[in-house]
Curated annotation (Swiss-Prot):
CDD domains: ASKHA_NBD_PanK-III. This is Type III pantothenate kinase. The lineage of its organism: Bacteria, Bacillati, Bacillota, Tissierellia, Tissierellales. Its EC number is 2.7.1.33. It comes from the Bacteria.
Amino acid sequence: MEDILLVIDIGNTNIVLGIFKDDELIFEWRISTDLHKTSDEYALTLRQALEYSNVKKSDVKEAIIGSVVPNLMPTIPKAVKKYLGIEPLIVDEKIKTGIVNKYASPKEVGVDRIINAVSACKKYSTPVIIVDIGTAITFDYITENKEYLGGAIAPGIAISSEALFMKTAKLPKIEIEMPDSVIGDSTVKSMQSGVVFGFIGLIDYIIEKILEEKDKTKDEVTIIATGGFSYLIAKQSKYITIIDKLITLDGLKIINDLNKND
């Protein structure tokens, strides 16, 4: 019999499930976030994922959930309890994290940002800037003393691209991919250029302003990217040196370990 930890990261676009055996992430699944699914449907999805990976449900001893989608709480915790028979730990502003939340109103911070901050402080040297390039783009700064100061939030790449399509009469829906040239020779290529290179510029400028405000050089700060579009955008950045797509799942594991005996 194994001691397995289930971690669930509920995002606006996707839900990511991970299975940890000891300190190793052995399986990861990504499903679409669906507000209309019932707890029974999510329980069936969980069952399929575990069976596909040959993980016995009796081996899953712990579960932890971090969510930025309030409407799926308590749907997914209920699914975990129904299928696995365990009460999942929920990440909120009261949970032990090992960092100091210096946000003006700590409960306002998205738990994904705190989870990422916890993970970054454990895995990398501080101070650190985390850029999460997902549905929204978040920037977070954590000091040498593991103080979470906050950061910036910008609209995401997909949201912005969708807005061009929805709010104009003639602009088409486009695939988000790296264009061959900044100067697009078609409407689609021009839009791809504006969206992709525009966001590279946005990300680098905000990082630059954070460094300036904290009186740091880029060599004095660990600068990490994560999120669905991190591989597309971060490789073109002048400042980002690490791409860590598992930072949130690792953070959930770290927080679970911190709260195990509470």
